Amino acid sequence: MDMGRVILGASTVSAVVLAVGLGVAITPGGGLTTDVQGGGICGTFPDDSTPVSTWFMTSFRNDTGHGIRVRDVRPAELHRVTLTHLSIATDPDASSPGLVVTDDADRPAEYGRTVPVDSGYVVPAHGELDVVGRLVLRDDADAGRLHGVVVTTVGPLGTLQSVTDPGSFGIGIGTGHAESDIGCDGA
């Protein structure tokens, strides 16, 4: 009888230790973060301009001491714009602007080389993830915006973690646009 209790007690202790160990292994230990609290940046073209487009870049920081694999990057919301390009900039210039208002379809040179968002890119320990994209204003709109960029990463044991940059990137024609239309004040 005493031997049975010893075996049962040892089994219980082992199960608890394994459960705690598994919980520690799959609990997120930090990841990507962003300093953006909201708001946005935008630009406008003169009245009667066509086509109207903009390039944008936003950054996420890896606060951990290990690399983090990116699984996916996507817009949270699109309002009257089309996202024609989205990629990861592997080494942008330090002076790269967050928004380049241009009708040029070519990516700005300051953004440097890019890789696809689903390439399995690994954000180095204490490094940055820079996401670049191109927005084109729809023909039937005078202002539009992207609100939020969502990055999904792969954590321990294949767990998925997502972080959202809540900022807006907007583009418009003319002036006097509501913030809800273009994503920033005063445009």
What is each PLM-predicted segment?
Residues D2-A187:
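Non-catalytic macromolecular-recognition regions in eukaryotic signaling proteins
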